[in-house]
């Protein structure tokens, strides 16, 4: 992940969490001068738990509650009606954070999405679908019945609560890693790293804006600006895609980041993506800092590092160790072992762990595997070992020779880390097209049959994946002769009109690509592996309402030029 982009991505300023809930807050009409505020929350006596929600967003919630007639109460204050918590909170953690043995009488534990919907609808909506179930033993003995609660509500509130319940708005997601090739099993949580769930403080409060910054290398504009159809001027020096990867900063804090990366990995394999992202943010901020960190105050001054994380940094500086590493669950190395099986992600690894499996032999002999997972397990060690560049060259030439046996004009290019000039590669992606725009048709199946007959392709993971006019094969290959390992190979056949954008996409790096796509979006454009389009209309949520107009891009240089970027050679895109 890009250290330089992260530093640019997190300016030292207060920021609003740009998820569905915070967008709702941004859309609340501002009160005009002289206009009396509507008090449609007059029956609400709320307490907002900031953990997970974040200070800035919680303050916005509290301001809106008061502005619209509601009251803010201490959690044990008389008459508190709603305790608002983060979406991912369960009742056990909520009570632990509140330091209460049971819920106060008359109070309901609700997700923050409920309050967001109330603000969006400008009314008190039903909590159905938003309330968090609490076993009766955690309810105060004096907790009134539902009928008693209804009877105590002010006039008009009962009717408001009886209105049809709306489903909670979907939580926005932005992938940190590529999607799994196979369907994941239901999520079952493994043992957490430690019982001290509140110990991470600020670094766990990662906003969707932070996520956007991580993947684009640019801190998003304010939420109010998201609705402006006119693209804002772009400062290119803040974008990863505008800079050569050779400008990556020297890591002056390696002794710190190494230990934090262990924790980040532990959270990641346990499926705690937001906490893992919080650590990634801090790690990259440290990597890009211009000097070794020497004090707590200096650590706090770095954008992307909060007080809790600064405490961990100082602990490492003073003792050379981080005590939290001593409490990493024994499940972590097992989960990492399992998640390295091709076709098995975090959720599947957690499911296997919960079923009692502890080794690859357990998986091999007892687990129910998909076809892809069985292949991934069979070639586990081969897939994990990166291949030397010379082997990737041999694989590219084998595919090229087989393809050009059908048509000598076919272009075959190995992409990915190979094209970026890396000394080793994890897999090989070969892109195939023909300059006449026609002769690539029909080559896909014939090429695969030929490579199978040669014994070059040994296993099929995904025989054919249609993506518009592009066809993609995911499989396993092995070069002829003794001593060669099984390697992951993807073959993608594309029309020539899409070749430049596909070449850019499959060359990567993934971080560089995400930065380019985010930049295109700010310009009212859209970039994908198929095309670069302009005049793209999006709604207020950023979703495309139409395809726009496709721009001609004969070469990669045209894509850079149309985006107003200096051209970067593949070796300069290795962010």
Curated annotation (Swiss-Prot):
CDD domains: BRCT_polymerase_lambda (cd17715), NT_POLXc (cd00141). It catalyses: DNA(n) + a 2'-deoxyribonucleoside 5'-triphosphate = DNA(n+1) + diphosphate. This is DNA polymerase lambda. One of its GO terms (biological process) is DNA replication. PANTHER family: DNA POLYMERASE LAMBDA (PTHR11276:SF28), DNA POLYMERASE TYPE-X FAMILY MEMBER (PTHR11276). SMART domains: POLXc. Keywords: DNA damage, DNA repair, DNA replication, DNA synthesis, DNA-binding, DNA-directed DNA polymerase, Lyase, Manganese, Metal-binding, Nucleotidyltransferase, Nucleus, Transferase. The lineage of its organism: Eukaryota, Metazoa, Chordata, Craniata, Vertebrata. DNA polymerase that functions in several pathways of DNA repair. Involved in base excision repair (BER) responsible for repair of lesions that give rise to abasic (AP) sites in DNA. Also contributes to DNA double-strand break repair by non-homologous end joining and homologous recombination. Has both template-dependent and template-independent (terminal transferase) DNA polymerase activities. Also has a 5'-deoxyribose-5-phosphate lyase (dRP lyase) activity. DCTP binds at residues 386, 417-420, 426-429, 513. Residues 166-178 have a biased composition (Pro residues). Residues 36-132 form the BRCT domain. Residues 194-203 have a biased composition (Acidic residues). Residues 265-279, 345-348, 466-505 are annotated as: DNA-binding. Its main location: nucleus. Its cofactor is Mn(2+). The gene is POLL. It is found in: Nucleus. The keyword DNA-binding applies. Belongs to the DNA polymerase type-X family.
